[in-house]
């Protein structure tokens, strides 16, 4: 795993290890998901076996003891810059929102890396921070409910999956 022991710095000089943080993306249909669903360079996982967890950033940033960092590109990318909590109010200006929301990225390396900007959260995430789940089919939704999922579950095969 390339990120497990990778040491980085925020633009303000705070050192951290990317492997100590749980990465979340800001939108759907990431290049990594494409590779996982197609089996490019990794073990193939079918869409029915992938569930998105949608986490409340507000809950995280409003918890004083919660450590988080965000990047403006994929965390292992050479072009990524990292920002600490003091920059959270600037997030809309620091991230390339058009690239993040784009579904066309294969012919543009920079767009592909910027699409994969990350919100990195240190430590475990309380289950009540999960606002909803997104899954591929009604069958998967029913399975999640059967497993005890209490949060909102959205079925979104075209928006969220390849």
Question: Model-derived features: where do they sit?
Answer:
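Active-site-proximal loop/hinge segments that shape catalytic or ion-binding/gating pockets
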Residues: 1-162
């Amino acid at each position: 795993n390339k990120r497990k022991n990778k040491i980085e710095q925020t633009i303000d000089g705070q050192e951290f290890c990317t492997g100590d943080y749980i990465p979340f993306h800001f939108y759907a249909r990431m290049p990594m998901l494409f590779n996982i669903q197609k089996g490019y360079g990794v073990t193939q996982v079918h869409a029915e076996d992938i569930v998105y967890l949608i986490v409340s950033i507000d809950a995280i940033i409003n918890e004083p003891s919660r450590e988080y960092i965000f990047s403006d590109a994929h965390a292992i990318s050479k072009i990524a810059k990292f920002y600490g909590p003091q920059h959270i109010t600037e997030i809309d200006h620091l991230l390339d929102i058009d690239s993040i929301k784009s579904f066309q990225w294969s012919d543009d390396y920079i767009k592909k890396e910027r699409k994969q900007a990350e919100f990195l959260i240190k430590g475990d995430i309380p289950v009540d921070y999960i606002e909803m789940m997104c899954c591929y089919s009604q069958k998967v939704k029913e399975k999640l409910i059967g497993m005890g999922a209490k949060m909102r579950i959205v079925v979104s095969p075209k928006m969220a999956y390849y």
